[in-house]
Regions:
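Sec-dependent N-terminal signal peptides of Gram-positive bacterial secreted proteins and lipoproteins
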Residues: 1-11
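A residue-level marker of the well-folded mature domains of exported/periplasmic proteins
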Residues: 8, 15-401
Length: 401
């Protein structure tokens, strides 16, 4: 009986052990399965996130199907100014990407102070099937913002502004101040009166214009601490007659080099007619005033337009803003004229190397202003937000007329 009881007890123990072993094995198996599932899920999630990063925020559009709109404040055919430079960028993009002429829609002479005209031009682009619309003037900004909300499948890319929505509405501009600094060197070395003139579309309330004036003045000061920059403001982005009048007033005041931040080559034409010199803007204005233009501050807008349209084609458009510089090929100066002062090229080459190294930029460190105060911090770069939106001061050698 005892033996039977013992045998029975041994059998129960074995069964219990077997059951425990099975539970342990099942638990281990379940845990391993869960871990493998979690790992696979994490990997899939990472791959999905990577794919989303690469995909951008708008769907890809086949190259043969894409249509590009561009809104100009002027007519590119009428001169070498702002609209001409932007349109040359569109042409460069078209050639690089192999788009046909009927894939480009242009709207010309759209007054950036006429909201009805602006909206009509953009809506025409939408109705003609444009997938991305480049709005090239400051005053187009609010209409871009409005229509981007109404047409979420169309990209509105606005030049020179500050608004965006991170998806189908961005802004683009560049570090044109870098090229203006180099042009200032050329002007500062050429002047004999130590009076440089500067025709500006807008005044101290506009950081884009103020930054250009300051950079030009700082470049001139770096090679000629005795020179001053006299500024005449037209209060218009496009005013051919006003630009001529402003240039003439500066010449009458004794300025012997006329720089500009305005849309037409008229200041250079006025300089040539008066027998003085100049620095053009937007494109190489030596073709307009070959006896006056020492150099020109130039844009190569194709650097941005090609990148932007290509990103729409391959589906990587991410809605980010763009602020390119010399290292991106967006801004530079035209080749120096034969009558530039001796040593100018060497001085410009030295400054160019500093800028392109990335170790130094125009608005670094502490800067003295023309009201006796200072801006900036020793050993630090000025923030892009301050360059593009908070530059309401003038460098110490600037005189506003």
């Amino acid at each position: 009986m005892v033996a039977s009881l013992c045998a029975c007890g041994a059998s129960n123990d074995a069964a219990d052990n077997a059951a425990q072993t099975e539970e342990t094995t099942d638990a281990a198996s379940d845990e391993a399965t869960d871990a493998a599932t979690d790992a696979a899920t994490d990997e899939a999630t990472d791959e999905t996130a990577d794919a989303a990063d690469k995909a951008g925020v708008m769907p890809a559009i086949a190259k043969e199907d894409i249509k590009v709109g561009v809104i100009h404040i002027g007519d590119p055919a009428t001169g070498s100014g702002y609209s001409y430079a932007h349109d040359q960028g569109i042409v460069g993009m078209q050639q690089t990407l192999g788009l046909s002429d009927d894939q480009i829609v242009r709207k010309l002479n759209v007054d950036d102070g006429d909201t009805t005209a602006i909206e009509n031009a953009m809506l025409e682009c939408v109705e003609e099937g444009c997938n991305i619309i480049f709005a090239t003037s400051w005053g187009y900004m609010d209409t871009c913002e409005q229509l981007a909300a109404e047409y979420p499948d169309v990209i509105f890319s606005h030049a020179t502004g500050y608004k965006s929505n991170g998806t189908n509405f961005n802004n683009y501009f560049g570090r044109i101040y870098q090229a203006r600094y180099l042009a200032g060197i050329a002007a500062g070395m050429k002047t004999t009166t130590n009076k440089l003139g500067y025709v500006s579309a807008m005044g101290q309330e506009n950081s884009e214009c103020t930054g250009g004036i300051n950079a030009f003045a700082m470049g001139a000061y770096s090679v000629n601490p005795d020179c001053e920059v006299y500024v005449k403001v037209t209060n218009s982005w496009y005013d051919p007659e006003g630009e001529t009048q402003a240039a003439q007033a500066l010449i009458d005041a004794g300025c012997d080099v006329i720089a500009q931040h305005c849309d037409t080559p008229n200041p250079q034409l006025a300089a040539e007619q008066a027998g003085v010199f100049g620095v053009g803007y937007n494109s190489d204005m030596s073709k307009d005033a070959p006896k006056a233009a020492i150099t020109s501050v130039m844009w190569d807008w194709s650097a941005y337009y090609t990148q932007a349209v290509e990103s729409v084609i391959n589906g990587t458009w991410d809605g980010s803003n763009y602020f390119g510089g010399m290292s991106d090929g967006l801004v530079n100066i035209a080749p120096l004229a034969d009558f530039a002062a001796e040593g100018t090229q060497e001085a410009i080459d030295e400054a160019t190397a500093k800028i392109e190294s990335g170790d130094w930029d125009v608005f670094d460190g502490v800067i003295e202003t023309n009201d006796g105060s200072t801006v900036g911090t020793e050993g630090e770069h000025m923030a892009d937000a301050d360059i593009t939106g908070n530059m309401n001061w003038y460098f110490k050698n600037v005189v506003v007329k």
